[in-house]
Every structure is written in C-alpha cells, then in structure tokens.
Amino acid sequence: YAYQQVQEILSKKKYTGIFASNYISTLGTIFYMNEKDIKVPDDVSLIGFDDIMLTGLFKPKLTIVNQPLNLIAEAVVNSLLDRMKAPKDKGKITTIDAQLIIGESVKTI
C-alpha cells in the first residue's frame, strides 16, 4: 500500500522531501525510489518514522524519528490499570519524547 501511495504522490508533482509516517511507509518509499532510480538524498530527501534494526542496513543511512516503544507500551498499560481502578476519572495526557536520529538521507535540494 505504501508503495502505491508514493507512486501516486510522486507521479503528480516533484517533491524535494518525503516524511514517511511509519516503518512500512518508509520501506514502500525506499522500494519505489530504488525501482524508479530516484536517488536519496540527491533527488529526494527522506525521513522515516520508527527505528528498528533494519534501518542501519540502508544506504544512505536513514534519518529517522525514533519512538521509545517500550515507554509507550508502559504508559498504555499504566493508563489502562488506572482506568480499571477508577473508571469515572477523566484520565490524563501522557507525553513521551521522540528522538531524531540524523542519518545521510536528507540534504538541501
């Protein structure tokens, strides 16, 4: 699905950068660009979202936004447990910082 989305977007207009909203979208974008011989970052800059071990295998190294999934999971579980203890409470907003990991997939075009 991500591959088709990128194909549709890039067939309509030339963009200088793409922010892929999740790991699957990042992969679809990479596959499409490789197939069409679009060079990252020379033709299009790419920022991915979610860091898993495979991102280190790509050349150039991807710039990514890393979410601490373990902290997110912990916050979700704690929120559910709090809700079970006090179902009528409004709940709370929890924020967890993400980290930008600079790679080699972005440049000024």
Listing of model-derived features with the role each one plays in the protein:
Residues Y1-K12:
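Structural motif
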Residues S11-I109:
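Flexible loop/turn connectors
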